[in-house]
Structures are given as structure tokens and as C-alpha cells.
């Protein structure tokens, strides 16, 4: 399985196994076990690399103080052989929950003092939660054993496996967050929001060699990790990044540390604290005893945070805390307290991004004072309005604010991205194209109609420092207007046609082709079929041809970039390379939305290409020639068990291979399947032509008359014999003959499909390198090319729809409507004349006729 499939399998099983345990609690248990597995296997891997064999591992004991110290120096901790995760797995039925308790207690005793800050107490949440896994030792042991067997297949012993492990960890955190309810989901910042913030930060920090980043409300640590990954992609060496994190809740603080360690971040680059960020600021010192000599305030290159919204806090007196020189946030709303804390800890050339509730933009009182100070001192670089319902557990509108410690620009970029998202389950989600659209606007200080605007400080002053986004950016759809003249007399107003000017610029002759001017005010449609006329236009054809020429060598380029370089391509950096090439091809081609094109590329990259590249780089090019047993879940002994059912390609889908190499086999199957369809139709015809009395007279037809009853039909035909006498008998015999044929055809199809699967398996396993590469190109490049080729036609189709909509809008005039009303009233009046009734009925009818305009 690839990492996506493995993560989904683990989540599905874990969600079933947690039973009545709250998702937020169960999260801590499974993630704790995953982390323990990681530490165990990291120790084993490092000892193997240092020359220790498996037999030597069995001698790892805590009372061997010299070896224990050697391992602590090597790893930062020591785990004895009896307490290794692999030993737990090997115990099988002999494993007990006591093994876990003993191991976790021993771990705390065996941490290298220099690594206490990273590892001390990291399993406390798991340790205290073990009792909730069951009602007694037996049930707890079974629950823990099930968890261990569930996660034992997660790979953790190579650089690629850090990505797999991290992906699974993030996948589980995300799914637990989405199932955890209103408050419990707040520990997690959705990865798309993290990515948005990280791209902005990474852009600002590009080119720096050593970087310190800080999250004062770190939650799961995912936001910090995204920032680090984005910075490392631009700057090269991930080990040049130092991570500072602070988190109030102990279980979430442990989650932060686990997540950072499991991403392969060096322990020396992790500095995490469990504490109240607002109460206990970060004066840095080695120990309490030496704090007077070693005190050093923390200043970093970037601060990122998603603090709890509108949190209660205990504000200090004015002037007591240097962090809050711009003002003291209200006691019931700590949002600006977190912001000012973040800003204080920036270096002079640093940048920060923070998620806040929308209310911070316009609430008054002390918050208004803080906002004024931030604006007047040029700290706010950008305000990004996010879609509603994008965070787990809350649907309130949120923003990302981008601030700098020092900047000369007195403008603020206001971005309204509230309409750019896709729906996913209960929540809204930013797409890759939405993130890129926002990042491009922020990093380029772009004015984009109905999306972003660079606002001067004078305008903000005039609005009394109210930064509410709709004051500056109107993202609403234009209200539909109706032309009075055209409504009365028909015709399409010229101004409505002028509004499509972006199309007429590209297709200069098309307007004259589509419209014939009636007077100086309006025009009428000059063609019967708009689609046919537009697609036949020479300018439109030239436009589509120009687009195709820009992509004529795209398959060859993509094949060279990806297929020919699959073993060495940098998966982390390659998408940006492909994006730059795509945007270069689109430059100068109007109407096509570059962000739509980017989304097509990103979908292909994320869902297919990068996954396959990871597999090839981890397993070698022979992975392309591998097939796997197709595992399906079936009931066995009342339980769901996985059993093999045929084969699937490890990388290459069977249908792709069959479509390229086994077309005659597919054609033969298609012939039989076509016959199956015909048989179904013939049986339906027989049933439809049966007399209702005949249907009700036999058990061979179901009570509702919609189908034959197989067993009863067989009995009836047997009793009819070889010489049916009536049309009804002959119909039953024909139906049985068709059912017999259908059974044989289905059997043939099943056998042919089974044989085809075996042939496909043989073909895949015997592929030459050239054919393997051809199939990779067919899987990766051809679908992408097809979707990109659809984009110019999509732009043309939008014009066709707009022209048809204009024509429909004014095709019926007001006088036409009045005439239709009069006609309907007259028809109704005539029908009323034919009614009879008592004197009261007739009086009512007469009054209705008067209202309708009758006599």
C-alpha cells in the first residue's frame, strides 16, 4: 500500500477500535504508540548502523549501564530489548498492558539529560490513559495489542519513511480533529491554512541560512512543520531551521514534540515548553539556577500561530509587560494579546502570520487602540479573509493577518478570499489554486478586482482604523440590471454586449458575426445556433490552435522531467518547477484561468504522480513491474477479515495496461457484455408483452409483475415440455432460454476476466524498461494533457453561455408578457362561462370574471 492507502486503513480500523472512547482521547493513545514504535525502530536502526547485530540487541538491558549510556549518547534515550516495540509484537498473545506501563516508566528513567527538554514526560498522556482502554487488565491488554498490530506496518527506517510516517500522523490528527467536536478540534490547524501561512513566510525568509521559527500556541505542531518544510524547499538545508514551540495543554504539548521528532527534525533543533504563553513569556535561560547569568529574550525570524479565539485571560496592568506597549486586550478577548506577543518576539527583519477571528478588524475600545497603533507603525502587511467553516469545531469567519516588525510601506493589502474554496464533508477547504491565488496577491502586493486591494493609510484613518474587509474590497456579484428599452421592445442592449469586451478583444470578428445592430441602442442575434457559429469562427479556431501550439511539446517535456528522471527527481521541489513551466506556456494566452490550469496540475501531482514517484524512489524502478494481491474484506467466523481476491498493479492500473497491450481480449469481453445487455432487454420485452391476466395466473412472475421468479420459471417451463401450445407458454420458454444463455455468458465473462487478469499480471511483470516508461507516461502525462487541452474550450463555452443568456433575457418583451396574460385571462374567462352552480357560486364566479377583465 502507498501512504494514502495505509493511512486510510489505519484510520478506519482505529475509528472502529476506539468504541466508546472519545476521538480526542483515543488520538493520544494511538499517536503515542506510533511515536513509541518510531523511537524503538530509530534506536535499532542506529545500533545496526553502528555495527550491532540482532543477537547483540537481545543483550540490551538497563542494568548494563555502559551500553545504556552509549545508547543514550547515540539516540538521546535508551530502550531495553524487552521494551522494544518489535519485542511487544513478537510476544503475540503473551503481550500484556503491564509491558507498556513498565516500558514507559523505564523510558523516563533513561533519557539523556541533554535531551530532557525534548523527551521528558512525552508519554505521560499515554501512560495515564492506559486505564481507559478497557475495564480490566485482560480487555486493556487486548485493546493495546490490537493497536500495536494495527500500526506495526508503518515504515520508519528511511528518509522516505519520514514522509510516510509524517503523512499518516497528520492524516490521523486531521481525522481525529474533524471527529472531535467543537472544543477538541481546536488543537489542529487544517493543513491548507498551514500551507497558506507557510508559503508567505517562506517567501519572506528566502535566502537566509539559519532560521528560527516559533509557534506560541503550537497545538499538534503541524503549523510549525509546514513552515519548516516550505522554508527548507526554498533554502535547501532543513537542519538549519530551529523550532520553538509553546503549548498550554500537556497532552497537546506532547503531541507537538512527537510530531516534530518524527519528521526527522534534530532534537537539538527542537525547543518546546509546556506553559501559558500569555502568563509565562519566553525569557530564555539554561536552568533556573543560572537564569540570572544566562537570561536571553527570544527573538526569531518568523512567528506563526493559531491561538484560541476570543479567549479569557488575566491582563497585566498597563506598562507592566513590554509585550503590550500598544495596548491591553480586553479580559474576555485575548486575540490581540496573542498578536502582540507574537510581534514582540520577531527580529527586526522578521515576519509573522496569525489566525484570528474576523472581529479583531472592527471591534472598538482597547482593541481599536491596538489596531490604530499597529496601522500607524506600519506593522500590518496584509489581511486575508478566509472562507467560513474552514476550521474544525467552529464556523465563525476567520482571517490570517501578516505582520512585520519593521516595514516602510504605509499600505495594507486587504484580501477577500471568502469565496475561494471547495466543500469537503462538513467543512470548507482551500484548494491548491486558492492558496496560490492568495500567496501571489500577498507576495506581489497585487490589486485584483473583487479579490484584493492595496489600501493606503489615509483611507484607513478616514475609516477610523476599522479594517473590516467589505469596506475596502467588494467581492459581491454584480447586481443584475435590466434595460428598460430592451425590456419593452426587445433586442440585446449594446452595453450588455460591450460587457463581454474581454472576448471581443481576443475574437475581433466574432461580435459582428453574432449580432446585427437594430439601432444605436440594441442589437439582435444574427445566428440560429450560437455554439455552432462561435466554434466555426476563424478567430476562435486560431485561438484554440495557438493554445495547442503552446503545449505541443508538453508531453515530451513532462516525460523528460518525470519519467526519465523518476529515480532522482526532487519530489519536494519538482511541482514548483512544473508550475513555472506551465505558467510560462500560458503567458500571453488570454481568457484561460492560470489558476484553473494550476489546479489541474496540482490534482495530478498530489493524487497520482508524487505518490508513484515516492514508491519508485523507495523501491526502485522494478516497482513499476510489481503486482499485489487485491485484498478485500469478507466475513469469516463473524468477523471482518482481509482475504486476497485477484491482483492489482503496484503502480500501473490493470485497465491502463489492458488498454495498451491486451485490446483484443478487452474486445472479446466487450462482445459478451454487449450480449448480456441485449439479453436483459429481450427478457424485459417478453415481460412487458405478457397479458396482465397471464402474469397473475403464474408463480413464474413476481407479484408486482416486474420480474421473473427464477425457480418458479424453471418449474413452469419443465411442466410445459417441448411443445408449448399457447403464446404465454412460448413466452415462458423463451424467457428461460434467455436466462440459460445469460448464465453461460456471465460464466464466460468471468472466466475471460480471470484469464485477462493473469495475462495482465504477466505483461506487467515482463515489461521492458521502455514499455514501463511508456505506461508511466500514459498514467501521468496523458490525462493531464487532456484536461489542460479542455481549458481554452471552457473559456469559449463561457462566452457561448453568456451570449445565450443575454438572448434569453430579452427574447420576451413586456408587451409579450402582457399579451400572454391577456390570453390566459381570456381562456380562463371562457372556462368560467362553462361552470354552473347555485346563486352564491355564480356570484363568486362573476366577481372573478370582473377581476380578470371579463364582463
Question: Residue ranges of each PLM-predicted region?
Answer:
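Conserved S-adenosyl-L-methionine
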Residues: 183-305, 310-314, 320-327, 337, ...
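Conserved P-loop NTPase
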Residues: 398-442
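Conserved Class I SAM-dependent methyltransferase catalytic core
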Residues: 5, 9-10, 16, 22-38, ...
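Short, contiguous acidic/charged loop-to-helix segments that flank catalytic cores in large enzymes
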Residues: 314-334, 358-366, 387-392, 425-427, ...
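Non-catalytic, mostly N-terminal accessory regions of nucleic-acid modification and defense proteins
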Residues: 1-201, 268-277, 385-388, 412-418, ...
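Active-site lining segments that contact anionic ligands and/or coordinate catalytic metals
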Residues: 299-300, 333-335, 349-351, 377-381, ...
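Hydrophobic alpha-helical scaffolding
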Residues: 137, 158, 217, 245-249, ...
